[in-house]
Curated annotation (Swiss-Prot):
Gene Ontology annotations for the cellular component aspect, listed alphabetically: plasma membrane
Family indicated by similarity: Belongs to the TerC family.
Signal peptide residue numbers: none
Keyword match Nucleus: no
Main subcellular location: membrane
UniProt feature coiled coil, ranges: none
Name of the protein: Uncharacterized membrane protein bbp_156
Organism (species): Buchnera aphidicola subsp. Baizongia pistaciae (strain Bp)
A Pfam entry, by short name: TerC
């Protein structure tokens, strides 16, 4: 394993940057829920997150340049940027999954903010644990790949047949969900922003808790693909953790941008569903067909771009005529 550049000074600096960006993110995300310009605010938030990551990378470059040499500073500067951009690109399917889960369980925008608030911190904990202890710890949970992919494939097909993700798919009354609600004492009723509530004197979990667990499982499962990809760039835990953390925090804003775009456009709803079906098939065939991570990310980006182009140049022209 390579020697790490993570000195106490850099780790402390990272902690300060992390606290600052979390405060900024939480403040902005609290505003967007109650504003009509959610899309624009999310764009600002995404830009701030990216600029903060770049500023931190510049700090790394300056520190290494004056404590070691310019060559090592340049190498680590480019490595951090590469890891950050790679994590962002590989998280597209993760963000799409968030939207799909929120739609399936009819989670309001206010409740989405609560779930993503706690989900972000849990994702940071899980991600750092995976990096430190290795992906092999998740090998005994490999069955989750297939459970999640079957659910994705099933709900994706139903969504297409029911005319897009904008139409609510009644997952609450399916056999699988009814069994989960009964087995794990989960109520179908929301209780403000609470993850747990009391019914008939018994403490039960709310749908918010169920969706939070599903989102965290989703993040753990997809991180098995993304983290090894970052290890191909560098094995320095400091670079891996810092670039991953900055990327994860910025995903909330990316989700808001995606969610608002889907609400405004018609075709992209089918594009997201197609992406989720592709992800499920990719997971199911993982043992037989090895689809490269970058190829998968390229496919997802192409689908989204194609949907926007079709929406802009076909449906808008058609509506004018």
């Amino acid at each position: 394993m390579e020697n790490t550049i993570g000195t106490p000074t850099l780790w402390c600096s990272f902690g300060v940057f992390l606290i600052i960006i979390i405060i900024i993110e939480m403040s902005i995300q609290k505003i967007f829920v109650y504003k009509e310009s959610a899309f624009k605010i999310a764009l600002y938030s995404s830009c701030i997150s990216m600029l903060t990551a770049i500023l931190f990378d510049v700090l790394i470059w300056i520190y290494i340049k004056f404590t070691v040499n310019s060559y090592l500073a340049n190498i680590n500067f480019l490595t951090f940027i590469s890891g950050y951009l790679l994590e962002q690109s590989l998280s597209m399917d993760n963000v799409a999954m968030w939207f799909f889960l929120f739609q399936l369980f009819s989670i309001s925008m206010v409740h989405q903010r609560v779930i993503l608030f706690y989900g972000t911190f849990l994702a940071l904990v899980f991600r750092s644990s995976i990096i430190f202890f290795g992906v092999w710890l998740l090998s005994k949970w490999s069955f989750l790949f297939y459970v999640l992919s079957i659910i994705l494939l099933f709900t994706g097909i139903i969504t297409i047949l029911s005319n897009g993700v904008n139409k609510k798919t009644d997952v609450q009354n399916t056999f699988i969900m009814s069994w989960i609600y009964k087995k794990f004492r989960i109520t179908k009723n929301f209780s403000k922003n609470n993850f747990f509530t009391k019914e008939n004197g018994v403490i039960v979990a709310t749908p918010l808790f169920l969706v939070l667990i599903l989102i965290e499982l989703n993040d753990i499962i997809f991180s098995i693909d993304s983290i090894p990809a970052i290890f191909l760039i560098t094995k320095d835990p400091f670079i891996i953790i810092t670039s991953s953390f900055f990327s994860i925090i910025g995903l909330r804003s990316i989700y808001v941008i995606l969610a608002n775009s889907i609400q405004k456009f018609y075709i992209i709803k089918y594009g997201i569903t197609l992406i989720l079906i592709f992800i499920s098939i990719k997971i199911l065939l993982k043992e037989f067909v090895d689809i490269p991570i970058m190829l998968s990310s390229f496919f997802i980006v192409c689908i989204l771009v194609a949907c926007f182009i079709i929406e802009k140049f076909f449906f808008q022209v058609k509506s004018k005529n």
